[in-house]
């Protein structure tokens, strides 16, 4: 019975619980490894770090092709002919995502956070000016697509994926279905890799604490304060301001209702897609226009990614602060734009926002080896980060849909 329970837990149990167990076991191993070193002749926690390296390398391997196929599939299969007020909802989605990223920049500047990273001398070539960043950005955009995939040049990958996606919108349904199938296949591989996250987190935590000490946990706590603080500020300050702009009355009853009835469920499921039925039912109870919310809610689950933009921005700036790279405010605003674009491609993928961090890191000349370590840090704190991120993303879908619907009703009354 016990064996059956353990097997079910480790292979079919909640990912949140399994990652929590992996984190605690990694912490425990880091604490007892020094006392065992005299008996074993080596540091067991350092050896366990190999598990974390395998996990991070697997993520690095799948990330380029994942971004490439997902973006092509999403754009190629995008439906046209939506209602005119969808434009207002999409504007709110994109504006809210950008303002969330900008908020996280301000939080990161106010409370600079460093994380435990391993770097090699001479491995960095940080840009000095915004013009240099833009120059690098343009050159990366026009990279050869095969070369972009081979070198994990995510800017180039994104450019070619968008271009091919637009071109394939005029292809046959069979071709679009093939792209969908490839996208789904890679997503399944990602889900398989993510299922080993507890083992990877175990190795990452054990090695990090052995190498950097318990102080690394304090860095993660500060990182969580910046992350979750940015998300809470967005949920209860930025979003209400945007809602008030549309409906011209107290936005907080709507915000609290959506956070309570949509955000809580999303926090537990950690899936915007899984929360779509919940948001549909909530929209119905709010008596919103069915033709609008039936389109805007699924669309929001794919492009309304304020939480993901915050995650990408905060973790990227944490890496930047750790490496001692100087960042001007205009460059940080550019990062907010890039993070917002990245966030729109993070939907429907387990750990999607984390996998897109290398794209943002590339703006500052941070190599993929170090960016992959940042992804590993993201998985260590993912139990809280991913849940809060999803809660913000999903609840905002209903908030903005309701704001536009009520605004249209006010105009027509």
UniProtKB/Swiss-Prot annotation:
Membrane topology according to the record: Multi-pass membrane protein
Subcellular location: Cell inner membrane
Similarity section: Belongs to the dicarboxylate/amino acid:cation symporter (DAACS) (TC 2.A.23) family.
Membrane-spanning ranges: 22-42, 61-81, 89-109, 148-168, 189-209, 224-244, 305-325, 337-357, 363-383
Pfam families: SDF (PF00375)
Catalytic activity: L-serine(in) + Na(+)(in) = L-serine(out) + Na(+)(out); L-threonine(in) + Na(+)(in) = L-threonine(out) + Na(+)(out)
Main location as per UniProt: membrane
UniProt function note: Involved in the import of serine and threonine into the cell, with the concomitant import of sodium (symport system).
SUPFAM superfamilies linked: Proton glutamate symport protein
Organism in which the protein naturally occurs: Histophilus somni (strain 2336)
Annotated GO biological process: serine transport; threonine transport
GO cellular component: plasma membrane
PANTHER family noted in UniProt: PROTON/GLUTAMATE-ASPARTATE SYMPORTER, SERINE_THREONINE TRANSPORTER SSTT
Keywords: Amino-acid transport, Cell inner membrane, Cell membrane, Membrane, Symport, Transmembrane, Transmembrane helix, Transport
UniProt entry tagged with the keyword Repeat: no
Name of the molecule in the record: Serine/threonine transporter SstT
InterPro entries (UniProt xref): Na-dicarboxylate_symporter (IPR001991), Na:dicarbo_symporter_sf (IPR036458), Ser_Thr_transp_SstT (IPR023025)
Keyword flag Transmembrane helix: yes
Disulphide linkage map: none
One example GO MF annotation: neutral L-amino acid:sodium symporter activity
């Amino acid at each position: 019975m016990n064996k059956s329970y353990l097997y079910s837990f480790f292979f079919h149990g909640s990912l949140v619980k399994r990652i929590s167990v992996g984190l605690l076991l990694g912490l425990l191993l880091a604490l007892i490894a020094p006392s065992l070193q005299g008996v074993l002749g080596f540091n067991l926690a350092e050896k366990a770090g190999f598990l974390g390296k395998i996990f991070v390398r697997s993520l690095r391997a799948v990330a380029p092709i994942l971004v490439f196929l997902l973006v092509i599939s999403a754009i190629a299969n995008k439906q046209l002919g939506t209602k005119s007020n969808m434009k207002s909802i999409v504007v709110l989605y994109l504006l809210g995502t950008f303002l969330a990223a900008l908020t996280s920049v301000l939080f990161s500047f106010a409370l600079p956070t460093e994380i435990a990273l391993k770097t090699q001398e001479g491995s960095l070539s940080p840009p000095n000016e915004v013009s240099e960043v833009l120059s690098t950005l343009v050159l990366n955009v026009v990279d050869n697509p095969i070369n972009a995939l081979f070198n994990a040049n995510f800017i180039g990958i994104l450019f070619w994926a968008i271009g091919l996606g637009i071109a394939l919108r005029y292809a046959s349904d069979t071709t679009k279905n093939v792209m969908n199938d490839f996208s789904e296949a890679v997503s399944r591989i990602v889900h398989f890799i993510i299922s080993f996250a507890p083992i990877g987190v175990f190795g990452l935590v054990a090695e990090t604490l052995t190498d950097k000490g318990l102080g690394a946990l304090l860095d993660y706590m500060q990182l969580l304060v910046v992350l979750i603080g940015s998300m809470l500020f967005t949920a209860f300050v930025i979003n209400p301001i945007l809602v008030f702009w549309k409906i011209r009355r107290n936005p907080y009853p709507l915000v609290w209702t959506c956070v309570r009835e949509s955000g809580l469920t999303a926090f537990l499921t950690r899936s915007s897609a899984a929360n779509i039925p919940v948001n549909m039912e909530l929209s119905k109870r709010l008596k919103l226009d069915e033709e609008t919310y039936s389109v805007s809610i699924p669309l929001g689950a794919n492009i309304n990614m304020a939480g993901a933009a915050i995650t990408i921005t905060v973790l990227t700036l944490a890496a930047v602060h750790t490496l001692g790279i100087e960042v001007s405010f205009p460059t940080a605003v550019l990062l907010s734009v890039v993070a917002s674009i990245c966030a729109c491609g993070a939907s429907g993928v387990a750990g999607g926002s984390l996998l897109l961090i290398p794209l943002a890191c590339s703006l500052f000349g941070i190599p993929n080896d170090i960016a992959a370590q940042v992804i590993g840090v993201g998985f260590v704190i993912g139990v809280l980060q991913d849940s809060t991120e999803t809660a913000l993303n999903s609840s905002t879908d209903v908030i903005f849909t309701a704001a536009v619907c009520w605004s249209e009703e006010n105009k027509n009354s």
